[in-house]
A protein has these predicted regions:
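Anion-binding and metal-coordination hotspots
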Residues: 1-206
Length: 206
Protein backbone atom coordinates (compact mmCIF):
# COMPACT_ATOMS: atom_id res chain seq x y z
CA UNK A 1 0.00 0.00 0.00
CA UNK A 2 1.49 3.36 -0.96
CA UNK A 3 2.45 6.26 1.19
CA UNK A 4 2.86 8.13 -2.10
CA UNK A 5 3.16 7.42 -5.84
CA UNK A 6 6.50 7.78 -7.62
CA UNK A 7 7.53 9.62 -10.79
CA UNK A 8 8.82 7.18 -13.40
CA UNK A 9 10.91 7.21 -16.55
CA UNK A 10 9.55 6.48 -20.03
CA UNK A 11 10.59 2.85 -19.50
CA UNK A 12 8.40 2.68 -16.39
CA UNK A 13 11.26 2.57 -13.87
CA UNK A 14 11.49 4.88 -10.84
CA UNK A 15 13.46 8.05 -11.56
CA UNK A 16 16.93 8.20 -10.02
CA UNK A 17 15.94 11.07 -7.75
CA UNK A 18 13.01 9.05 -6.36
CA UNK A 19 15.11 6.53 -4.48
CA UNK A 20 14.38 7.77 -0.96
CA UNK A 21 11.45 9.28 0.89
CA UNK A 22 12.72 11.73 3.49
CA UNK A 23 9.30 12.07 5.14
CA UNK A 24 9.03 8.31 5.67
CA UNK A 25 12.48 6.67 5.56
CA UNK A 26 11.03 3.32 6.71
CA UNK A 27 9.12 2.96 3.44
CA UNK A 28 10.70 1.42 0.34
CA UNK A 29 10.16 1.57 -3.40
CA UNK A 30 7.85 -1.31 -4.34
CA UNK A 31 6.32 -2.53 -7.59
CA UNK A 32 2.54 -2.27 -7.45
CA UNK A 33 -0.25 -3.11 -9.84
CA UNK A 34 -0.28 0.45 -11.18
CA UNK A 35 3.49 0.95 -11.31
CA UNK A 36 6.11 1.90 -8.74
CA UNK A 37 5.10 3.25 -5.35
CA UNK A 38 6.84 4.43 -2.20
CA UNK A 39 5.19 2.42 0.50
CA UNK A 40 4.80 -0.86 2.36
CA UNK A 41 4.01 -4.47 1.59
CA UNK A 42 0.72 -5.33 3.33
CA UNK A 43 -0.15 -8.94 4.08
CA UNK A 44 -3.55 -10.42 4.96
CA UNK A 45 -4.66 -13.98 5.64
CA UNK A 46 -8.37 -14.39 4.92
CA UNK A 47 -10.81 -17.05 6.09
CA UNK A 48 -12.35 -18.86 3.14
CA UNK A 49 -15.87 -19.14 4.55
CA UNK A 50 -16.65 -15.60 5.66
CA UNK A 51 -13.86 -13.32 4.31
CA UNK A 52 -12.73 -12.57 7.87
CA UNK A 53 -9.11 -11.41 8.09
CA UNK A 54 -7.39 -13.73 10.57
CA UNK A 55 -3.87 -12.28 10.43
CA UNK A 56 -2.11 -9.22 9.04
CA UNK A 57 1.44 -8.01 8.55
CA UNK A 58 3.28 -4.99 7.14
CA UNK A 59 6.88 -4.73 6.01
CA UNK A 60 9.05 -2.71 3.67
CA UNK A 61 10.40 -5.81 1.90
CA UNK A 62 9.12 -6.34 -1.66
CA UNK A 63 9.19 -10.15 -1.73
CA UNK A 64 6.01 -11.86 -0.54
CA UNK A 65 7.80 -15.21 -0.19
CA UNK A 66 9.65 -14.18 2.97
CA UNK A 67 6.38 -13.25 4.67
CA UNK A 68 4.75 -16.67 4.53
CA UNK A 69 6.24 -18.20 7.68
CA UNK A 70 5.62 -15.09 9.85
CA UNK A 71 2.01 -15.01 8.60
CA UNK A 72 1.51 -18.69 9.43
CA UNK A 73 2.83 -17.99 12.93
CA UNK A 74 0.33 -15.12 13.30
CA UNK A 75 -2.51 -17.31 12.06
CA UNK A 76 -1.57 -19.93 14.66
CA UNK A 77 -1.31 -17.32 17.41
CA UNK A 78 -4.67 -15.73 16.53
CA UNK A 79 -6.74 -18.84 15.81
CA UNK A 80 -4.92 -21.67 17.56
CA UNK A 81 -4.62 -23.69 14.38
CA UNK A 82 -3.25 -23.70 10.86
CA UNK A 83 -5.64 -23.65 7.90
CA UNK A 84 -6.92 -26.88 6.37
CA UNK A 85 -5.86 -25.51 2.99
CA UNK A 86 -3.53 -22.66 2.08
CA UNK A 87 -3.98 -20.83 -1.24
CA UNK A 88 -1.35 -18.26 -2.22
CA UNK A 89 -0.39 -16.43 -5.39
CA UNK A 90 2.88 -16.69 -7.28
CA UNK A 91 4.63 -14.15 -5.09
CA UNK A 92 4.72 -16.67 -2.23
CA UNK A 93 5.95 -19.57 -4.33
CA UNK A 94 9.48 -20.59 -3.42
CA UNK A 95 11.24 -23.89 -2.89
CA UNK A 96 11.65 -23.13 0.82
CA UNK A 97 7.95 -22.34 1.28
CA UNK A 98 6.80 -25.42 -0.63
CA UNK A 99 9.10 -27.72 1.32
CA UNK A 100 8.16 -26.09 4.64
CA UNK A 101 4.46 -26.64 3.87
CA UNK A 102 5.13 -30.28 3.00
CA UNK A 103 7.04 -30.77 6.26
CA UNK A 104 4.15 -29.24 8.21
CA UNK A 105 1.66 -31.50 6.45
CA UNK A 106 -0.10 -28.36 5.21
CA UNK A 107 -2.25 -28.79 2.10
CA UNK A 108 -0.85 -25.77 0.25
CA UNK A 109 -1.50 -24.46 -3.26
CA UNK A 110 1.02 -21.92 -4.56
CA UNK A 111 0.66 -20.51 -8.05
CA UNK A 112 3.95 -21.35 -9.73
CA UNK A 113 3.61 -18.59 -12.34
CA UNK A 114 1.41 -15.59 -12.93
CA UNK A 115 -1.49 -16.41 -15.22
CA UNK A 116 -3.20 -14.00 -17.58
CA UNK A 117 -6.68 -13.05 -16.36
CA UNK A 118 -9.26 -15.67 -17.30
CA UNK A 119 -6.73 -18.26 -18.44
CA UNK A 120 -6.02 -21.58 -16.76
CA UNK A 121 -2.95 -23.78 -17.15
CA UNK A 122 -3.23 -27.04 -19.06
CA UNK A 123 -4.23 -29.87 -16.66
CA UNK A 124 -1.52 -32.36 -15.70
CA UNK A 125 -1.93 -35.88 -17.05
CA UNK A 126 -0.43 -39.28 -16.30
CA UNK A 127 1.64 -40.40 -13.30
CA UNK A 128 4.02 -37.87 -11.76
CA UNK A 129 7.75 -38.40 -12.43
CA UNK A 130 9.60 -39.53 -9.32
CA UNK A 131 12.41 -37.00 -9.70
CA UNK A 132 10.28 -33.84 -9.55
CA UNK A 133 11.68 -31.06 -7.38
CA UNK A 134 9.51 -28.98 -5.02
CA UNK A 135 8.37 -26.55 -7.71
CA UNK A 136 7.68 -29.42 -10.09
CA UNK A 137 5.51 -31.16 -7.50
CA UNK A 138 3.59 -27.97 -6.80
CA UNK A 139 3.15 -27.17 -10.48
CA UNK A 140 1.68 -30.60 -11.06
CA UNK A 141 -0.56 -30.29 -8.01
CA UNK A 142 -2.10 -26.97 -9.04
CA UNK A 143 -2.54 -28.09 -12.66
CA UNK A 144 -4.72 -31.02 -11.63
CA UNK A 145 -8.47 -30.44 -12.01
CA UNK A 146 -8.88 -30.33 -8.24
CA UNK A 147 -5.90 -28.00 -7.88
CA UNK A 148 -7.22 -25.58 -10.48
CA UNK A 149 -10.60 -25.45 -8.75
CA UNK A 150 -8.97 -24.74 -5.39
CA UNK A 151 -6.61 -22.06 -6.77
CA UNK A 152 -9.57 -20.33 -8.43
CA UNK A 153 -11.08 -19.76 -4.98
CA UNK A 154 -8.44 -17.12 -4.26
CA UNK A 155 -10.25 -14.73 -6.60
CA UNK A 156 -13.40 -14.94 -4.48
CA UNK A 157 -11.70 -15.09 -1.05
CA UNK A 158 -8.70 -12.76 -0.86
CA UNK A 159 -8.96 -10.40 -3.81
CA UNK A 160 -12.45 -9.11 -2.89
CA UNK A 161 -11.21 -8.22 0.59
CA UNK A 162 -8.51 -5.94 -0.78
CA UNK A 163 -11.07 -4.52 -3.21
CA UNK A 164 -13.50 -3.78 -0.38
CA UNK A 165 -10.85 -2.06 1.72
CA UNK A 166 -9.12 -0.08 -1.02
CA UNK A 167 -11.90 0.43 -3.55
CA UNK A 168 -15.22 0.46 -1.71
CA UNK A 169 -13.95 2.14 1.46
CA UNK A 170 -11.28 4.30 -0.17
CA UNK A 171 -8.51 3.15 2.19
CA UNK A 172 -5.88 3.01 -0.53
CA UNK A 173 -2.95 4.73 1.19
CA UNK A 174 -1.52 5.22 4.66
CA UNK A 175 -2.11 8.48 6.48
CA UNK A 176 0.64 7.88 9.04
CA UNK A 177 4.40 7.57 8.58
CA UNK A 178 6.81 4.91 9.80
CA UNK A 179 6.61 1.12 9.78
CA UNK A 180 5.18 0.84 13.30
CA UNK A 181 2.37 3.33 12.64
CA UNK A 182 1.64 1.85 9.22
CA UNK A 183 1.35 -1.59 10.85
CA UNK A 184 -1.11 -0.21 13.39
CA UNK A 185 -3.11 1.51 10.65
CA UNK A 186 -3.31 -1.69 8.57
CA UNK A 187 -4.43 -3.66 11.64
CA UNK A 188 -7.14 -1.04 12.24
CA UNK A 189 -8.32 -1.32 8.63
CA UNK A 190 -8.52 -5.10 9.00
CA UNK A 191 -10.38 -4.82 12.31
CA UNK A 192 -13.01 -2.48 10.90
CA UNK A 193 -13.37 -4.77 7.88
CA UNK A 194 -14.06 -7.69 10.23
CA UNK A 195 -16.52 -5.67 12.31
CA UNK A 196 -18.45 -4.85 9.15
CA UNK A 197 -18.55 -8.51 8.12
CA UNK A 198 -19.73 -9.61 11.56
CA UNK A 199 -22.34 -6.84 11.71
CA UNK A 200 -23.83 -7.82 8.35
CA UNK A 201 -23.81 -11.49 9.35
CA UNK A 202 -25.67 -10.65 12.57
CA UNK A 203 -28.28 -8.63 10.67
CA UNK A 204 -28.77 -11.45 8.18
CA UNK A 205 -29.28 -13.95 11.00
CA UNK A 206 -31.75 -11.74 12.91
Amino acid sequence: MPSRNLPTTAAGDPKANAQRNFTDPDSHILKGGDGWIQGYNCQAAVDGDHQIIVAVGVSNQPSDATHLEPMLERIMANTGQLPEKLIADAGYCSTDNIEASEERGLDAYYSTSRQAHGKRPRPSRGPAPRDLDARGRMDRKIRSKAGQAICALRKIIVEPVFGQIKGARGLDCFLLRGLKKASTEWALMATTHNIGKLHRAALAAA
